[in-house]
């Protein structure tokens, strides 16, 4: 958003921790895009079905129709998406998609996008970034947002007044015992929205990701991206049996895993990637491959223990198609 605003607008971005400690940096799989107009109907149906047809169809339509323009902008800004041996963009597949329509940068797509945009933002004279600063309240009168109250890393509090405020504070994974999110992502915007009467929507819709690297320790879980299953990985139960279609929507796969864990009295199942060689997996999924190897597993040959964990906030602050909330001059974007 900051990069899209006119240069004569002063923009202040505050982050709760350092700029590289955000969930966008952790996103692995990729970004869905409408490859051609003939795919629209299939793409729309896949998205609506995955959302149990509770999605806002207008929002889904806008998301799909604008995807090519958004991806084009990212490419123009310097984001590097993987290509195949012929130099064409390499589209992968993930759960609930009937077709390959996901662009990616190895298994660190979020980091590639976020680093690229941050590097540009840091060079803009009209953009100031202040890390380790926490929003603790809205400043509002008569349902018009006028700014925020914040606290820095030393406990000093202050007010920031602005004509418009955009909330992009992520989800609430830090409130969970096990989550793929950073621990400081604690749903701050949702709490303040409730306090000030800003309308929320589907706040109880919290996504559990089926496959995170199993650990007996509590805290942030390492994600085994859905795109690994899109490239042929399979799930196995305690008996080494395949028990579900791995590319169903995440809630369906998670429920199937939970049933297997109940059946065998375990707290994990297994994933393995028989469709790739060690060299191929290390190139396509370098971070995932290394994380598994650190635990003693070659994902192409071994059964890697995985377990579900909280991943994404599906609901949040209700907005219109322009990101406007029920409070004037207050906007919300992304997972918020």
Task: Locate the predicted segments by residue.
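Glycine-rich FAD pyrophosphate-binding loop
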Residues: 6-31, 35
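Glycine-/small-residue-rich beta->alpha transition segments that form the dinucleotide
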Residues: 17, 162-164, 168-173, 297, ...
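An anion/pyrophosphate-binding glycine-rich loop and adjacent beta-alpha core
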Residues: 19, 192, 198-305
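Glycine-rich active-site loop/strand segments that organize a redox cofactor
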Residues: 32-63
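Short beta-strand to alpha-helix junction loop
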Residues: 55-68, 100-119, 130, 179-187, ...
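Conserved redox-cofactor binding core of oxidoreductases
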Residues: 76-156, 161, 168, 212-215, ...
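A glycine-rich dinucleotide-binding beta-alpha-beta segment and adjacent secondary-structure elements
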Residues: 130-131, 136-145, 150-151, 284-336
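Short hydrophobic core segments
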Residues: 148, 159-170, 193, 240, ...
């Amino acid at each position: 958003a900051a990069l899209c605003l006119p240069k004569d607008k002063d923009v202040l971005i505050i982050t709760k921790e350092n700029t590289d400690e955000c969930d966008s940096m952790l996103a692995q799989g990729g970004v869905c895009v409408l490859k051609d107009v003939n795919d629209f109907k299939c793409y729309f149906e896949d998205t609506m079905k995955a959302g149990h047809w509770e999605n806002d169809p207008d929002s889904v339509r806008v998301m799909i129709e604008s995807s090519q323009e958004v991806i084009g902008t990212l490419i123009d800004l310097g984001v590097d998406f993987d290509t195949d041996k012929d130099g064409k963009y390499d589209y992968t597949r993930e759960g609930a998609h009937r077709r390959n329509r996901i662009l990616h940068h190895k298994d660190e797509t979020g980091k590639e996008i976020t680093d690229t945009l941050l590097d540009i933002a840091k060079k803009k004279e009209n953009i100031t970034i202040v890390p380790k600063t926490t929003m603790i309240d809205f400043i509002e009168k008569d349902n018009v947002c006028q700014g925020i109250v914040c606290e820095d890393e030393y406990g000093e509090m202050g007010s920031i007044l602005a004509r418009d405020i955009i909330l992009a504070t992520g989800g609430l994974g830090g409130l969970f015992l096990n989550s793929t999110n950073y621990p400081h992502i604690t749903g701050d915007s949702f709490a303040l929205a409730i306090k000030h009467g800003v309308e929320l929507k589907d706040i109880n819709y919290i996504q559990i990701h089926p496959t995170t690297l199993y650990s007996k320790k509590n805290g942030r879980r390492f994600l085994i991206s859905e795109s690994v299953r899109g490239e042929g990985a399979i799930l196995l139960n305690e008996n080494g049996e395949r028990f579900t279609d791995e590319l169903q929507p995440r809630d369906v796969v998670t429920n199937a895993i939970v049933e297997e864990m109940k059946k065998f009295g375990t707290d994990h199942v297994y994933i393995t990637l028989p469709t790739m060689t060690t060299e191929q997996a290390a190139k396509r999924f370098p971070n995932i491959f290394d994380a598994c190897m650190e635990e003693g597993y070659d994902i192409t040959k071994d059964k890697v223990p995985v377990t579900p964990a909280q991943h994404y906030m599906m609901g949040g602050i209700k907005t219109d198609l322009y990101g406007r909330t029920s409070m004037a001059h207050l906007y919300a974007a992304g997972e918020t």
